[in-house]
Each structure stands twice: as structure tokens, then as C-alpha cells.
Amino acid sequence: MPGKIAVEVAYALPEKQYLQRVTLQEGATVEEAIRASGLLELRTDIDLTKNKVGIYSRPAKLSDIVHDGDRVEIYRPLIADPKELRRQRAEKSANK
């Protein structure tokens, strides 16, 4: 008989952070943890088909199994390409 596990689900914005603790059955997935957290209803900007997810800063898939004590993280999409930003900074410093 599977037991219960406790998992945290985190989502951070520049102005506010969300951290929800949920209790799930052993063998639950990342997606089940996110859905159980209620964050999808609270934040309509989260789209699991677009937002990447991870467990303790390591990339994960929605189908990955979570373990007791895990922190599932929902990442916001990048608003700018990091390579492009570095190129722009390099050009700016070269022009000084």
C-alpha cells in the first residue's frame, strides 16, 4: 500500500513568490504535484505546455516521479535570448 509524501511546488515572479506544500501518494508525478498545488488556477500565466519545470533547479519532465521532500519548480519563459544580450553588452562596451 503506497504511503503519503510531502512536496513543495514553487513559482516565482519578480514581485511575488508562491510556495505551496502538498501531500500526495507515493509514485505521484511532477504534473500531479503542480495540479494539486492549485497554482494553475491561481496563476493563469502558467502553461505546462510552455513553462519548463524542475526539481531543485534540475530540469525535469512532467512525467517524472516526485519523492518526499522534493521542491518542484515552475520556471517562467525567458523574455530575452541570453546570447543576444551578451552580444549587445559586448558591442556596447566595445563602443566606449
Swiss-Prot record:
Keywords, sorted A to Z: Toxin-antitoxin system
Pfam families (UniProt xref): Ub-RnfH
Disruption phenotype: Deletion of the pasT-pasI operon causes reduced infection of the mouse kidney but not of the bladder. On rich medium operon deletion decreases bacterial persistence about 100-fold. Forms small colonies on rich medium. Delays growth on minimal medium supplemented with threonine, increased sensitivity to oxidative and nitrosative stress. Growth defects are complemented by low levels of PasT expression.
Transmembrane segments: none
InterPro entries xref list: Mopterin_synth/thiamin_S_b (IPR016155), RnfH (IPR005346), RnfH_sf (IPR037021)
Keyword Zinc-finger: no
Gene3D superfamilies: RnfH-like (3.10.20.280)
Function: Antitoxin component of a type II toxin-antitoxin (TA) system. Unlike the case in E.coli K12 high level expression of this protein abrogates the toxic effects due to overexpression of the cognate toxin PasT.
Similarity remark: Belongs to the UPF0125 (RnfH) family.
Protein name, as recorded: Persistence and stress-resistance antitoxin PasI
Source species: Escherichia coli O6:H1 (strain CFT073 / ATCC 700928 / UPEC)
Source lineage: Bacteria, Pseudomonadati, Pseudomonadota, Gammaproteobacteria, Enterobacterales
